[in-house]
Regions:
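Cofactor-binding beta-sheet edge motifs in enzyme active sites
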Residues: 1-151
Length: 151
């Protein structure tokens, strides 16, 4: 995903320039694995704490994988099934991509945020990989509730 946006000091929008490549594998049984993620990310005028930003970006990749594969709220008989943390599925550490490569570049533009809006491309990358590998196109998340097996 490449996101470009005109930015300046007076805007109220979150903005950043980034390019992200996701390498996704799907076993014949339908197990999805993010094998590698490569990120090039704008630092704006300056980056005060690169390690902090790097960890923020890594966390976002893992959390958006979680969104794509597991997160859902189920209503049964008028009640929420996942009504406590022990019933709400989240990703485990072994589901994290073993390789996340992050490179920063400086555009000299204003950087207005490093929040959780950076890598929604994880869901679409996994969805596209599912389609390319299995021939099945899903339009609803989480993908983990779908039959992802293929022959």
């Amino acid at each position: 995903m490449i996101a470009l946006e005109e930015r300046g000091a007076e805007t109220n929008r979150m903005a950043a320039i980034s390019a992200v490549v996701h390498t996704v594998a799907i076993s014949r049984e339908g197990k999805v694995k993010l094998e590698r993620v490569d990120i090039a990310h704008d630092t704006g005028f300056s980056l005060v704490n690169p390690l902090s930003v790097k960890k923020q970006l890594e966390g976002q990749i893992i959390w958006f994988y979680n969104d794509a594969m597991h997160q859902a709220i189920t209503i049964k008989d008028g009640h929420v099934v996942e009504n406590n943390f022990n019933k709400f599925r989240i990703s485990h550490i072994d589901e994290a991509p073993p390789e996340i490569n992050i490179r920063f570049f400086k555009t000299g533009h204003w950087l207005l945020g490093m929040g959780h809006d950076r890598f929604t491309s994880v869901q679409s990358a996994i969805g596209d990989a599912i389609f390319q590998i299995t021939g099945k196109r899903f339009r609803d998340l989480p993908y983990g509730r779908q039959d992802l097996s293929w022959t």
